[in-house]
Amino acid sequence: MKKGADTMNTIKKIKNIYPLSHMQEGMLFHSFLRKEEGAYVEQSLFTIKGSLSYDWFQRSIQAIIDRHDIFRTVFLPHVPHLSGPRQVVMTEREFHLNSEDISHLPTNDQNEYIERFKEKDKQKGFDLQKDMLMRISLFKTAKDEHVCIWSHHHILMDGWCLGIVMQEFMQIYQSIHAGKPLSLDPVRPYSTYISWLTNRDKEKAAAYWDTYLKNYSAPSPLPRVSDKETKESYHREDLIFSLNKPLTDKLKETAKQHGVTLATLIQAVWGVMLQQYNRTDDVVFGAVVSGRPSEIPGVEQMIGLFINTIPIRIKTHQDETFHELLIRCQKEMLEAEPFTCQPLFDIQANTALKQELIDHIIVFENYPLQQKIADSADQTDSPLQIDQVQVSEQSGYNFNLVVAPGEELVIKFSYNAFVYDAAWISCIKRQFTQALSTAAQHPHMPIADFSFLDATEKEQIVTQFNNTKTEYPKNHTIIDLFREQAEKTPDHTALVYGNMSISYKELDKRSNALARELIQKGFRKNETAGILAAHSPEFMISVLAVLKAGGAYLPLDAELPPERVSFMLEETQAKMLIVQKGLEQNAAFSGTCIISDAQGLMEENDIPINISSSPDDLAYIMYTSGSTGRPKGVMITNRNVVSLVRNSNYTSASGDDRFIMTGSISFDAVTFEMFGALLNGASLHIIDKSTMLTPDRFGAYLLENDITVLFLTTALFNQLAQVRADMFRGLHTLYVGGEALSPALMNAVRHACPDLALHNIYGPTENTTFSTFFEMKRDYAGPIPIGKPISNSTAYILDTKGRLLPIGVPGELCVGGDGVAKGYLNRVDLTNAVFSPHPFLPGERIYRTGDLARWLPDGNLEYISRIDRQMKIRGKRIEPAEIEARLLEMEGVQEAAVTLREKDGEAQLYTHYVGDHKKTDTDFRADLARVLPDYMIPQHWVRVERMPLTGNGKIDRSALPIPENKPAKRQNIILPRNLVEEELANIWKQVLGVNTISIDDDFFAIGGHSLRALQVIHTLKHQQNIDIPIDFLFEHPTIAQLAEKLYSKQLTAANEQHVIKLNQHGAQNLFCFPPISGFGIYFKDLALLLNEKAAVYGFHFIEQDTRIEQYVNCMTDIQPEGPYVLLGYSAGGNLAFEVAQAMERKGLEVSDFIIVDAYLKEQPLPIDTGNDESAAYLPEAVREKVMKKKRNYQEYWAQLLNEGHIKASIHFIEAGIHPETSGHTGLTKWEGACGNYSEYTGFGAHKDMLEGTYAEKNADIILDILEKITSNQVILHKR
């Protein structure tokens, strides 16, 4: 390296050349690699009081430089004839002191000046190949007072050395001051240590650390309770605190009694805390060791870079006490002592975690710098006093725990403020203090009982975080409150469904009528009635009717498999089944059936029912997935529901609001939607599934109906927000929940809808729908909290023994309060297992959710994951065990394992099974669909020869093979036969993530579901401008069926509408006339390319003789006034010329007419009777209609003559490629038939100009013309 060689040549005398330590090599490498100024620059700032001589100061520092080789060293990445980098010790280096008098400045200005200098000095950095790697600056701030800034490169020495250097400085300065000769013991150079390091047994050290870290595979970081981005930089903050003397003494005494060092005790305590933060019994963190091997004589006075970071592993065993852990940790530390010089990089490289092995470090300052300086001053009777020492070191870790001994232990948390926030660091401080106290007071405590929750934090969690009591009508039933509302606002709209609007008074009467019918047919108080319905007014009327009759309702979604419906009716012993009119064929019930018809309920039966109910009576039974293979019926009372929707902190619903029902009637969110509206005087809109799953239609409905409050499952929200983030802008409150939220999408919606109150909502069915809420008021990069308990609910994080856990420690989220359900129907064992006595309020109960969560310091909760195998799919809670149980009931399945995996950002179910070779995945899906709802049907099926097992004989789910992203080989794949089928196949492949699709594949049998269907609908709209309701895909689930339906739909539109709008909007309208194929859809590619530049309307060929008049009327309907811009391609150019003449005769202004490769038609031509190959690519059902339109167009065009003149400007785009046999040169262009004329040479042959490869290039020409039209420029020359 030339620079290194030049440096060598400038050195007159070299004392020594030797290799670098591993840590020095790393710093050298990164200093050249990163190049940012200030890297590895360490700074110390301290105050010097006394009469200071600059000359004596400089002489003292120069003496230190002369004494220690390391201060005269430069570092070269390459030295000729030597391998590897080297440190070169010069015989002499001259030191220059920088000094400045700022005593004239006010104190605040002095401080600011010094801070600016520090930063500037740090940014200056060092050139390792030539600089003296140490700078010292003195600032006089007052008489006999200076501030010293001492900067050095970390490659020279570690922080442990600074105390040695400062001690020597005080001794040397005192000698000069006293005029006495210097008497310091000689020191050994740093090269002595490098020699020792080179000769040690590295393989033996590596083997030790490999054994020490064996089987450690999961990182154990200090949790980051912060949502700050870490990419900005490293902004260091420090939290420094002391342990009082009694606690410090007790810790020292405990360590001594158990025969361990204080460092070992503190490391053990920290390790146990880290275990609880990570829910594990095995953690690793880093510890900084001095790195000074005792076998080197005089090593304690050497100056250089000795420190090293080693891993500390704290692994605890069942029933182990803290005392036993201490003894084992001390033993391990002694065993590790000979190997503490092994480079951390080498240790990490041999582990599975590599750089993730260590997340943070602990540093023990066994002899603090301040104490060394003080001792030195006392010993020498120095004229100078040094205090207020500040050492600025920055490790590569985001958190450092530094412990300094003394009468009171001083602890410093040095952390990156871009990663950890101050509130969480303060919380750790309190918990660490409590943990140390617990260890000192109870060293024989079992680790399993070790807690660092102090009384203050317990009070904070139990009282402050759960201060949720509000007044609400807890002694009223749902019907009490509904009747109050109906009397208060009888004419206010209660329900809206399509064109039907039902007032509170009407709803009250209709539900009275149905309730009376129930009673007349034998329904009694406290019995259960099933309601089989879809989204409809009938469902809402039926719910109120059952409650008025004193019973509990069982919601049964019409889409549930009949077997599941039958099971629920049987287990609940339902006495009656109310069936929505039109769904009678779905009802398989031996009891009494009542048909519910919102239109047909007679008012003569609407006399109120006077059956008294209690708030503790059941309101409904709702089923969730069960681990035993059968679903669980959750029993919800009237009070549960009332507490959810009345006077609660998460909602301000009133009579001015309009809610909308989006969830399945068997999904618990419908409870909030129904009663949140009707018990607060609001209106409830009920929409069909098709509208809800079509983003444009759903967004339009929200705006047109001024919907104010909406709940969406996370999965549905994600799909809708991806299409249009601003579709919720008319709402004032949006609740999203069911699964973890996407921060990116939530951020996007928040920005697109600035007036929207956007909530993350959480809650299990067993706690009546909602338990916690969090309003998102800023952007999030990481997990969005689930918030705080709703009113009259409580939340606790408990361990497996039911004990309260501290802030930041994950545990089971348990919820209490007035929303807790009665339990599970007919499942006493399961009820007792998860509905437990309240740990703090005698006589009350909590529900153990099975969810893992933790408290954040601000009182919000953060959801982490499920504890058990329960999962969430599209907002619905499922038990894999239930699916597995059903699979094992099926013929051909011997073993089955169901798992959840993330694929393309979506949670998907995978089934691995041992079973029949003959049955296909489609067969198994079909069998499962008969007994389970669609969201519980796995998308991916993998047949295995045998299940992988764990050591204890259980299925090893982590070892199940991940299937390749391709379907199994099939015998009869039918490929697309026409363009529409081909486009549909491409969209399906994209949405389903598969490579091969047959046009007879059922979308829902090969991994599709309602939300993926929504993606297909959106993609069709976006790519092809084809807008279809989602019902189309449910009714026509194969590509062949859907393609035929689309052709028929387009053909019907062509026959009825004559024009199709092909893109969203643009600065001006462009009316396009079709080629001989006869359909305006031909211009779809052009429309996509011109979107937002021009609104493209494609005309179809009109077969009636009044076509010209109809075209003119269509255009004036769309655009009442001119000027108009027309485009005609091929035969459409001739047709459009006739239309332009007719418009001008009517006095309409046609400013411009773009003709794409059509020539003036001056004589009739024979009709082309040749075979039309395109007919073969059309679906059979529409082939004849399409070809008929084309033949009629051919006949019209063959006889058409373009005569006369138009005032409009003509822009003629001619094909760039002409067949040699076309006779092109004899055709007449349009110069003599218009006002202004311009000509352009296009791209491609005639048939390719507006499709495929050349469409974009020719669209650019058209766009250029449109822009010039807009700016009223007329091109008068041929281009």
Swiss-Prot record:
SMART domains: PKS_PP, PKS_TE. CDD domains: A_NRPS_Srf_like, DCL_NRPS. GO terms for molecular function: phosphopantetheine binding; transferase activity. Pfam families: AMP-binding (PF00501), AMP-binding_C (PF13193), Condensation (PF00668), PP-binding (PF00550), Thioesterase (PF00975). Residues 14-1047 are annotated as: Domain (isoleucine-activating). Residues 975-1050 form the Carrier domain. One of its GO terms (biological process) is lipid biosynthetic process. Residues 503-898 are annotated as: Adenylation. InterPro entries: AA_adenyl_dom, AB_hydrolase_fold, ACP-like_sf, AMP-bd_C, AMP-bd_C_sf, AMP-binding, AMP-binding_CS, AMP-dep_synth/lig_dom. Belongs to the ATP-dependent AMP-binding enzyme family. Its EC number is 2.3.1.-. Keywords: Antibiotic biosynthesis, Multifunctional enzyme, Phosphopantetheine, Phosphoprotein, Transferase. Residues 1068-1273 are annotated as: Thioesterase. Its cofactor is pantetheine 4'-phosphate. The modification O-(pantetheine 4'-phosphoryl)serine is found at residue 1010. This protein is a multifunctional enzyme, able to activate and polymerize the amino acid Ile as part of the biosynthesis of the lipopeptide antibiotic plipastatin. The activation sites for this amino acid consist of individual domains. Residues 14-317 are annotated as: Condensation. PANTHER family: FATTY ACID SYNTHASE, NONRIBOSOMAL PEPTIDE SYNTHETASE. Binds 1 phosphopantetheine covalently. This is Plipastatin synthase subunit E. NCBIfam families: AA-adenyl-dom. GO terms for cellular component: cytoplasm; cytosol.
